[in-house]
From Swiss-Prot:
Name by which UniProt lists this protein: Argininosuccinate lyase
GO BP terms in the entry: arginine biosynthetic process via ornithine; L-arginine biosynthetic process
Domain of life, source organism: Bacteria
One term under GO cellular component: cytosol
Keyword Transit peptide: no
Organism: Burkholderia mallei (strain ATCC 23344)
Amino acid sequence: MTSQLHKKGEAWSARFSEPMSELVKRYTSSVFFDKRLALVDIAGSLAHAGMLAAQKIISADDLAAIERGMAQIKGEIERGEFEWQLDLEDVHLNIEARLTALIGDAGKRLHTGRSRNDQVATDIRLWLRGEIDRIGGLLNDLRGALIDLAEQNADTILPGFTHLQVAQPVTFGHHLLAYVEMFSRDAERMRDCRARVNRLPLGAAALAGTSYPIDRHAVAKTLGFDGICANSLDAVSDRDFAIEFTAAAALVMTHVSRFSEELVLWMSPRVGFIDIADRFCTGSSIMPQKKNPDVPELARGKTGRVNGHLMALLTLMKGQPLAYNKDNQEDKEPLFDTVDTVADTLRIFAEMVAGITVKPDAMRAAALQGFSTATDLADYLVKRGLPFRDAHEAVAHAVKVCDARGIDLADLTLDEMKQELPNVAHLIGEDVFDYLTLEGSVASRNHPGGTAPDQVRAAAKAARAALGQ
């Protein structure tokens, strides 16, 4: 006799007096996006089946048949031969139906002591765990590329900005290492998130657990989980681990977006600090001269997309009572797209950073504008006994004078400087010009975390060691 699963297309058909409408089938089906969970679904099912056999809940023959059938199904999926059916709603029922078709009643016994509620929660955690590991590796690749570029430019000087106004000279290497720090924290957040992802829901069943004598710890060990979810209601209903991952991913993209904004500005002909390799740029269909930094621009845009996924998942969870609700089917597309977006972005950026051409002369010329060493002149006066606020006021006056004349502080002669700063003239000597050079300015910040070239090289070495390189 044909099973209800094959007769009506739903695993619960015997309860109802009429079949599901075609519109509702399309509305509720998830198979065409959750099929990417197929291989982890098979892994989870095999671990579950092995435990059932070990606990004498199913026979050794049933286990052998399940393992044989799953091996065939896995091969069909990997070769693109598996026929996904909308009528079977999701990845779980599609695989179960195929398994039953291949091995008969043994396939029907696989779901003993299990619900799709704990099954899908397990699948998502298994899948996400692997993706977190992959993203961690991609973050390391990007960090490595940034460290390489930073080491090459430990002595390259450019203006540092606050409020997009010239502030103080810094080295380009120091600037790049700021992003290494950001992406290092992102990697830490991913590792921290992974610890909470890596808990086994299987065994929670629908919501209350199961009456079968299962061994959840054995399944957890087989699947590489650090432990089990301690409460069955929580195990099947909460997606906070997905929200936490997406929040960490949103921070990754936020840091990428900040870097992207600078890349776009630096590549602008009005700035001209860098050039991005042609393979990462596009042209214009109407303007022949254009070379557009589309990759960093798109990354800025895709950051909003990931931020939107975070808000979608937060909103998805906020109104759900315990335990499982169908709302949770909507967790997958935002989660899947977040993973895809972050992974693609990191891979591209690591390659793009390695191909950046730096233009040191343009950077240096920009650093010579905007009185970037004014703070150094104030520090010079402070070191000779003047209170900082008085030094600040004196230098501000000198800047005003130079600005009106269209010159920089370093362009003043010693006599002119003393003339413009009569109240502190006795503190100013020939050595003042050592403080007003770009090289002198950055070299003086010679402490951990500072922009001095020696500190940049030391920081790059430490960052590389943290990567295990």
